[in-house]
Amino acid sequence: MCIRDSFFFGDLASGGALVRGGKLKAFIPGGVSAPWFGPDQLDVPLGQDEVANQASMLGSGSIVVFDEATCPVRAAWRITKFFSRESCGQCTPCREGSGWLERIMYRLEHGGGRIEDIDLLLDLCDNISPGLLWPPQQTTICVLGPSIPSSIHSAIKMFRDEFVAHATNDGCTYA
């Protein structure tokens, strides 16, 4: 069975729309700690090895879906905010890195961002999880730290133009 055939995607298998009527923009195959997938990856088989071969993971087993009305910058900021709050503070990369990432994402989302913030985010992500490899390199006591960069890195990789628009248009352009 591939991801497209999972119950969550409803009639996407026949080219239909998501439940709210929008078209698929992106999805996360294994909860918010996993790298994002695009619509072209709906036919990836729903198995640990197959998803790992596409540089992601099934993780918690939840599939997070974004339709065309979803702002990827806002989604990545909210996920980063969650991870920042979950950090126990014991490890420096997680404690310092998650807070810094959250503040930069907040700036981009709320109108204070700069174009340089995009590359700064990627640099910080690389410092938390060196090389941004999958599976992530362990730089902290637990796996929370190396999971934090996944959403930001994926969102920038897939939707860099939307990050640029946030940095140059005083924040989010979505309603």
Describe these PLM feature segments.
Residues 4-175:
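Redox cofactor-anchoring modules in respiratory/redox and cofactor-processing assemblies
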